[in-house]
């Protein structure tokens, strides 16, 4: 599949899938493992929403605006490694500091899976690769892609100014936007 061979996705996938395998092997066994995977997944969906809403449409707008001006540009499409690697290390260290080791491993499995899903959904929403046509037909994915399209466009007009009325900050879920009343 072509998407796997783009440089960013390939490196991201190798690094994070290796970590996910490690976390999965050394995490809890049984139902606690799946509970903490689920909680890690949910935590990442909130982090994704909150960082987009509070940071990228706030103090980091000038950096993020490049993506709104050229949404399909590979340079601005995925979270840059200069941001994601230090942030990932900080998050992993924070979980390790506050949670028992096995909990951290399980939690980070869910967190990592959610982050991979986020990167792929965001890539698919802007690139629409032909080999992913079957994914584009799944109702849940269609709803996510429509919501993200509304984040970038309103009435056919591209939203690229900080004062534009942005909505739909989540990528992999709609529920945080519904809770914060930013869903359209």
Describe the predicted segments one by one.
Residues 1-31:
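Metal-centered catalytic cores of metalloenzymes
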Residues 39-56, 109-128:
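Transmembrane alpha-helical segments that form the membrane-embedded catalytic/substrate-channel core
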Residues 23-30, 48-55, 78-88, 105-114, ...:
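Phosphate-binding glycine-rich loops and adjacent basic patches that engage nucleotide phosphates
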Residues 49-70:
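Membrane-helix interface/capping segments
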Residues 36-39, 61:
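Short amphipathic alpha-helical segments
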Residues 11-23, 77-96, 170-171:
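Core segments of transmembrane alpha-helices
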């Amino acid at each position: 599949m072509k998407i796997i061979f783009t440089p960013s996705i390939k490196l991201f996938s190798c690094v994070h899938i290796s970590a996910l395998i490690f976390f999965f092997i050394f995490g809890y066994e049984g139902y606690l493992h799946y509970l903490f995977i689920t909680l890690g997944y949910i935590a990442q969906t909130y982090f994704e929403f909150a960082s987009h809403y509070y940071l990228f449409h706030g103090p980091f707008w000038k950096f993020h605006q490049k993506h709104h001006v050229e949404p399909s540009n590979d340079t601005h499409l995925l979270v840059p490694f200069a941001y994601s690697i230090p942030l990932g290390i900080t998050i992993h260290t924070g979980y390790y500091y506050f949670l028992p080791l096995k909990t951290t491993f399980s939690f980070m499995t869910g967190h990592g899976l959610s982050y991979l899903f986020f990167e792929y959904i965001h890539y698919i929403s802007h690139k629409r690769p032909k080999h992913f046509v079957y994914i584009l037909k799944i109702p849940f994915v269609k709803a996510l892609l429509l919501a993200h399209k509304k984040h970038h466009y309103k009435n056919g007009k591209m939203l690229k100014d900080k004062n534009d009325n942005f909505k739909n900050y989540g990528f992999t879920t709609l529920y945080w936007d519904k809770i914060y009343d930013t869903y359209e």
